[in-house]
């Protein structure tokens, strides 16, 4: 009897097993991908995965600047990094869950349809392009314009934008709407989301050719990133991404993300 009572008391006093937690690296001010209010589509996808895992979501908020991966995922401060280009060297990546492209953004009323990187009209236009820095690590459209001698009529907009304001990457799309530039070359998910909110109707068309000078693609597959020593987690996330493929597709469409067939 004493043994039974001791076992019963132990059970009654036991605390529940720790619930599983999915810790996510994310930028707190980077719509349409993520923000601290969890309004981005990456936030929503993470919530889908966590629900499937029976886990709660915890965020490590860190502005996506140089050193982002080194200071977050590689320091084991978080488990996954959503929205990373498939196959990057610094992390292990899952199979992609969407594929998008850089796009030309112009005012619909200007009739700038059918542009390509080699279109002679570009020489006469004010062009906006997303920039990273001056050390050779710029965006593919920036390199493509430079290779064609399109420099004097190009205005750079920092990829990260002014972090002191909400939605810092939106500045380049707003510049098109305001007429500060005639056309801009913008990463599709950013362009689609902010163009959908613009009071000025905007036209979006994929940048072509999609591969410039062999090393500058305009189309990217997007994956989740995990540490290389977490192959089991990577497989688990891949399985969940596959199970929720239809929901993810609908979610991306609701955020106006341009999709490219694989």
Please state what every model-predicted region is.
Residues 6-13:
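Bacterial N-terminal signal peptides
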Residues 107-132, 143:
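Flexible hinge/capping segments at coil-to-helix
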Residues 27-30, 99-102, 111, 156, ...:
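Periplasmic-binding protein-like
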Residues 67-68, 74, 82-92, 177-216:
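A ligand-binding cleft/hinge motif common to bilobed small-molecule-binding domains
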Residues 109-117, 134-135, 151, 229-234:
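Short helix-loop capping/hinge motifs at secondary-structure junctions, enriched
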Residues 19-90, 162-166, 254-258:
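Extracytoplasmic small-molecule ligand-binding "clamshell" domains
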Residues 56, 133-160, 235-262:
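Ligand-binding clefts/hinges and TM-proximal coupling segments of bilobed small-molecule sensing domains
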Residues 49, 71-74, 120, 175-177, ...:
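Hydrophobic residues within well-ordered alpha-helices
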């Amino acid at each position: 009897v004493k043994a039974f009572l001791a076992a019963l008391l132990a059970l009654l006093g036991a605390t529940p097993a720790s619930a599983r937690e999915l810790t996510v690296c994310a930028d707190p001010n980077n719509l349409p991908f993520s923000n601290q209010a969890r309004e981005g589509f990456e936030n929503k996808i993470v919530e889908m995965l966590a629900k499937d895992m029976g886990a709660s979501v915890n965020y490590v908020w860190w502005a996506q600047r140089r050193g982002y991966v080194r200071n977050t995922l590689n320091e084991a401060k978080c488990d996954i990094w959503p929205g990373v280009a498939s196959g990057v060297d610094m992390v292990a990546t899952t199979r992609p869950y969407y594929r998008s492209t850089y796009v030309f953004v112009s005012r619909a009323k200007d009739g700038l349809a059918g542009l390509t990187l080699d279109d002679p009209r570009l020489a006469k236009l004010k062009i906006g392009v997303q920039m990273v820095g001056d050390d050779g690590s710029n965006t593919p459209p920036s390199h493509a314009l430079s290779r064609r001698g399109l420099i004097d009529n190009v205005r750079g907009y920092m990829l990260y934008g002014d972090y002191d304001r909400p939605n810092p990457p939106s500045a380049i799309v707003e510049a098109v709407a305001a007429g500060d530039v005639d056309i801009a070359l913008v990463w599709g998910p950013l362009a689609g989301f902010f163009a959908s909110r613009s009071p000025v109707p905007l036209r979006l068309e994929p940048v072509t050719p999609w591969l410039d000078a062999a090393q500058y693609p305009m189309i990217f597959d997007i994956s989740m990133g995990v540490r290389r020593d977490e192959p089991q987690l990577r497989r688990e996330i891949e399985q969940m991404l596959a199970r929720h493929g239809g929901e993810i597709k609908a979610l991306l469409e609701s955020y106006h993300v341009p999709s490219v067939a694989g």
